[in-house]
């Protein structure tokens, strides 16, 4: 084989490699664009609410008034998944402080495609109270988060569309508009900035029935915990009242083997220290 043929072969090889690389990049880009809005939201739910088989964290909630006065809620949050991602879940929360919520517990049985079951144990009156489905949009223990914000909203309850793709800071995001199919919530639609890399929601904007911006959620800090990108600090602001809630997750862990027996009315009243400390 002469020198010209060898050079020609090398050139063809380089061209083929370059074309293969371009094809791979194009395929990756097209695969992202091929995602429907529902698929993006589902991936976001999985990344935000379903990572690991189970989850535990100590949570500090700082409730801050328009004037700057602060109240602190401290609790332990536990969560266990049942079945495939996007399926049933159970949540258990135990409150340490302040005094008016000390020893209070909250439990959720989350179901796909039907209303979740929620219970609240109030130690002051030694009573377990069931949270009605219509109360899912009410304030969670006086914070700017709702009960539904804590455990997630069923994907099928909203109509979703990708309205644009843009950067939020350094992150490439899908911007999803989610419009409730029923008028049983206090907002008309929500815009979500969802990271294209890890699919975590980085920002949510809630618009009220008049179409005015009413609440804003921001993921302020993301850390890797056992290989799971985890939002460890999040803020919800109520633009109408000027109130905001800053939530920090500390001592976070995944796949610790939470027992099924924890999620019972018995342990709502007497939570085991093994899981709450």
Language-model segments: which ranges?
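Short, basic, low-complexity termini and linkers enriched in Ser/Thr/Gly/Pro
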Residues: 1-31
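Residue-level signal for secondary-structure boundary sites
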Residues: 33, 65-67, 101, 184, ...
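N-terminal mature ectodomain segment of secretory-pathway/periplasmic proteins
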Residues: 37-124
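Short amphipathic beta-strand and strand-loop transition segments with alternating hydrophobic
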Residues: 76-83, 161-167, 220-222
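Short solvent-exposed loop/turn micro-motifs enriched in small/polar/acidic residues
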Residues: 86, 101, 112-113, 158, ...
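Gly/Pro-enriched, hydrophobic low-complexity segments
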Residues: 96, 107-109, 117-121, 127-131, ...
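Surface-exposed beta-loop interaction hotspot
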Residues: 152-158, 165
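Short, low-complexity, Pro/Ser/Thr/Gly-rich segments in the mature regions of secreted, periplasmic
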Residues: 266-276
């Amino acid at each position: 084989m002469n020198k010209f043929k060898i050079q020609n072969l090398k050139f063809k090889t380089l061209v083929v490699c370059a074309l293969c690389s371009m094809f791979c990049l194009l395929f990756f880009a097209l695969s992202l664009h091929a995602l429907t809005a529902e698929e993006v939201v589902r991936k976001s739910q999985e990344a935000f609410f379903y990572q690991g088989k189970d989850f535990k964290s100590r949570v500090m909630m700082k409730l801050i008034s328009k004037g700057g006065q602060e109240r602190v809620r401290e609790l332990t949050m536990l969560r266990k998944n049942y079945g495939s991602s996007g399926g049933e879940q159970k949540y258990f929360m135990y409150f340490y402080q302040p005094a008016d919520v000390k020893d209070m517990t909250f439990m959720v049985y989350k179901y796909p495609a039907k209303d979740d079951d929620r219970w609240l144990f109030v130690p002051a009156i030694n009573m377990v109270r069931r949270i009605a489905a219509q109360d899912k949009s009410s304030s969670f223990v006086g914070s700017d988060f709702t009960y539904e914000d804590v455990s997630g909203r069923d994907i099928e309850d909203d109509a979703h569309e990708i309205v644009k793709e843009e950067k939020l800071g350094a992150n490439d995001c899908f911007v999803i508009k989610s419009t409730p199919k029923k008028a049983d919530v206090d907002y008309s639609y929500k815009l979500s900035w969802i990271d294209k890399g890890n699919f975590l929601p980085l920002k949510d904007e809630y618009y009220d029935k008049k179409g005015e911006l009413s609440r804003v959620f921001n993921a302020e800090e993301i850390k890797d915990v056992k290989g799971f990108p985890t939002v460890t600090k999040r803020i919800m602001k109520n633009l109408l009242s000027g109130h905001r809630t800053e939530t920090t997750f500390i001592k976070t862990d995944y796949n610790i083997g939470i027992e099924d027996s924890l999620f019972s009315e018995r342990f709502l009243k007497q939570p085991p220290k093994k899981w709450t400390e």
